């Protein structure tokens, strides 16, 4: 095998739906079926659209065709984005990392560091300049860094699948009808397309904030556990003991007794050992 053939991991990436495998709207199912039938990587649009610099808007030098590795990545990525597409908000309800994992584009180094470069470059260096998606980064004031990109699918994206803008608009109207039917059933007023889009975006933003705070707290707890477990076991147990003594009241300590307190130290120590090696449970 030549070095050229061996320079990427997983030469045949395929999108695999997450375990929850939620039921998708009929339009999404239709679009995903089209994606399985059409070679989106060799679509005529890829040869006629002039890619542009996403910051300056100036034309970029274009290539005649995608190399086969990036073409394979694009085929998987299109299906993944469709699966997570919210018709009302026009947003992909998944992070680049999640899309990368589900497409088999992520890699792990020998020391366990994950890389999503292949997926990230596909989006940043091809899909965005071509106008198939737009991406927005939002600063997280709580954690002091950027949140995962908010990815929006454009009408051009659906043209890859031979789905017209009119079909996309009709799908939005159908989705809005379903939303309003549920609202009326609950005794609430129906909403407009613009309001439905705003609400869907707000929900995604709230969920993203909750996820990031949860993830931040998890890694903070894991870091503290790793610091404690790195100590000599006797010293670590003494620290746990002191923390438990400070936590419990005198009456609670009396009830526990020496054996009960020792048992709590054992439970806490092995719990911290488990936390120290756990990974965040991404979907």
Curated annotation (Swiss-Prot):
Coiled coil: none annotated. Keywords: DNA replication, Plasmid, Plasmid copy control. GO terms for biological process: DNA replication; plasmid maintenance. InterPro entries: Plasmid_replication_init_RepA (IPR003446). It comes from the Bacteria. Disulfide bonds: none annotated. Pfam families: IncFII_repA (PF02387). This protein is essential for plasmid replication; it is involved in copy control functions. NCBIfam families: RepA_IncFII_LM. Belongs to the IncFII RepA family. This is Probable replication-associated protein repA1. It comes from Buchnera aphidicola subsp. Schizaphis graminum (strain Sg).
């Amino acid at each position: 095998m030549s070095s050229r053939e061996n320079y990427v991991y997983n030469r045949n990436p395929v999108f695999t739906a997450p375990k929850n495998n939620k039921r998708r709207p009929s339009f999404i199912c239709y679009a995903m079926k089209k994606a399985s039938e059409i070679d989106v990587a060799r679509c005529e649009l890829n040869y006629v659209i002039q890619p542009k610099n996403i910051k300056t808007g100036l034309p970029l030098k274009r290539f005649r065709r995608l190399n086969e590795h990036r073409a394979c990545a694009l085929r998987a990525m299109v299906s993944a984005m469709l699966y997570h597409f919210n018709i009302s908000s026009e947003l992909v309800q998944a992070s680049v990392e999640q899309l990368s994992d589900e497409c088999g584009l992520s890699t792990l180094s020998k020391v366990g560091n994950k890389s999503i470069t292949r997926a990230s470059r596909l989006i940043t260096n091809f899909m965005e300049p071509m106008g198939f998606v737009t991406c927005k980064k939002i600063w997280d004031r709580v954690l002091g860094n950027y949140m995962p990109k908010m990815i929006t699918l454009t009408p051009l994206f659906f043209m890859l699948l031979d789905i017209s803008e009119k079909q996309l608009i009709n799908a939005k109207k159908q989705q809005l009808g379903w939303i309003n039917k549920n609202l009326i059933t609950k005794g609430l007023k129906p909403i407009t397309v613009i309001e439905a889009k705003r609400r869907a975006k707000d929900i995604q933003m709230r969920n993203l904030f909750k996820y990031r705070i949860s993830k931040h707290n998890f890694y903070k707890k894991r870091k503290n556990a790793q610091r404690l477990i790195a100590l000599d076991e006797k010293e670590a147990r003494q620290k746990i003991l002191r923390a438990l003594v400070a936590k419990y009241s005198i009456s609670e300590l009396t009830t526990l007794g020496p054996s009960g307190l020792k048992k709590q130290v054992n439970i806490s120590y092995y719990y911290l050992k488990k936390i120290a090696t756990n990974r965040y449970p991404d979907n």
